Regions:
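C-terminal helical subdomain
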Residues: 226, 247-290
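Conserved glycine-rich cofactor-binding loop
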Residues: 61-62
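Conserved NAD(P)H cofactor-binding loop of Rossmann-fold oxidoreductase domains
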Residues: 136-141
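Conserved glycine-rich Rossmann-like NAD(P)H-binding loop of the short-chain dehydrogenase/reductase
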Residues: 76-94
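Residue(s) in the substrate-gating loop at a strand-loop-helix junction
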Residues: 186
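Substrate-binding pocket helix/loop in short-chain dehydrogenase/reductase
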Residues: 144-145, 149-154
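Active-site helix of classical SDR
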Residues: 168, 202
Length: 311
């Protein structure tokens, strides 16, 4: 037998073995997901008596939060009210007027401790059950370490991380079996992003917090999903993110390609959460991004981002 024939057989065996291992792990993963879905389906419905079932949405005044409110209003059965939380009362009131479901408007700045106290008081005094919690409040600013002010960096950490954790912990005592939580992370959580470093790091924190929280809440039959979209082209996020860049200077990110509409993100992530899945990547590009972030070295991902942001 020649060397080439031997090499060919070795390669064939390796490919065949790798394929069998991959199929085995895929089958195991599918079985585990199905078991988890059955556990959720078998969870006893909470006996809430006279309590109203509400959906609590932060960052509801615009963008993705607004789309979640509209979609829940159209599709979520059994909700008595949708609680809308954001800073801009006028926008919240305008959105409340568009919804058919009952609403409760809470104009709060979640970076302030007194706002968390007000939220907790409202939940307790209203005697409600939080059926759905969606943490959409978020902030991103583009720029390297020299371009971003300390205030910009601190605000991103406050809104994206501390406020999300505080709202979640505040709402959890009011949730029962069958409750659902969606934490809005980002594909930025999958790798470091130069010129977007603080934002990406803040989303890494929220992503890992959400994954850990999901395991902690399994015994309570509360479904927790980390929602990781790519750019959303029809929200205020991109204009606000670019606000830190001075006029006339070369932009750190030239194009925001492969963006998806916010309503698609809301629709797909809600469906993923209902199925009890841990992560939602609502779009082809963000799904590919997540897959390759697990395979490729960080250095390769960093150089790929460097290329992508210059296109």
């Amino acid at each position: 037998m020649s060397f080439l024939e031997t090499l060919h057989r070795v390669v064939d065996w390796c490919v065949g073995f790798s394929g069998r291992v991959f199929v085995l792990f895929a089958v195991i993963a599918i079985v585990l997901v199905l078991i988890e879905m059955l556990v959720y389906a078998a969870a006893k419905k909470p006996k809430t008596g006279h309590k109203k079932r509400v959906a609590l949405i932060t960052g509801a005044s615009s963008g993705l939060g607004r789309e979640y409110a509209k979609r829940l209003d159209r599709t979520e059965r059994g909700l008595d009210e949708i609680w809308l939380v954001a800073r801009r009362a006028d926008r919240l009131n305008a959105l409340a007027g568009e919804l058919g479901c009952g609403t409760h408007v809470l104009p709060l700045d979640l970076t302030k401790p007194e706002s968390l106290t007000a939220l907790k008081t409202a939940l307790r005094e209203s005697d409600v059950e939080v059926a759905v919690l969606i943490n959409c409040a978020g902030l991103g600013k583009i720029g390297n370490y020299a371009k971003l002010s300390l205030a910009d960096s601190d605000n991103m950490i406050e809104v994206n991380d501390r406020a999300a954790v505080d709202v979640t912990v505040t709402a959890l005592p009011f949730m029962g079996p069958g409750g659902r939580i969606l934490e809005i992370c980002s594909t930025a959580a999958f790798q470091p992003l130069q010129h977007f470093g603080v934002y990406a790091a803040s989303k890494v924190f929220l992503y890992h917090y959400t994954r850990a929280l999901r395991m902690e809440l399994l015994p309570r039959h509360i479904r927790v999903t980390a929602v990781c979209p790519y750019w959303m082209r029809d929200t205020e996020f991109i204009p606000i993110a670019k606000a830190a860049e001075a006029k006339g200077e070369k932009p750190a990110i030239k194009n925001f390609a492969f963006g998806v509409p916010a309503d698609r993100v809301a629709r797909r992530s809600l469906r993923t959460n209902r199925l009890g899945m841990a992560v939602s990547t609502p779009g082809l590009f963000c799904t590919i991004h997540r897959f390759f972030s697990k395979l490729l070295p960080r250095e390769v991902l960093l150089y790929f981002w460097e290329l992508l942001r210059r296109l």
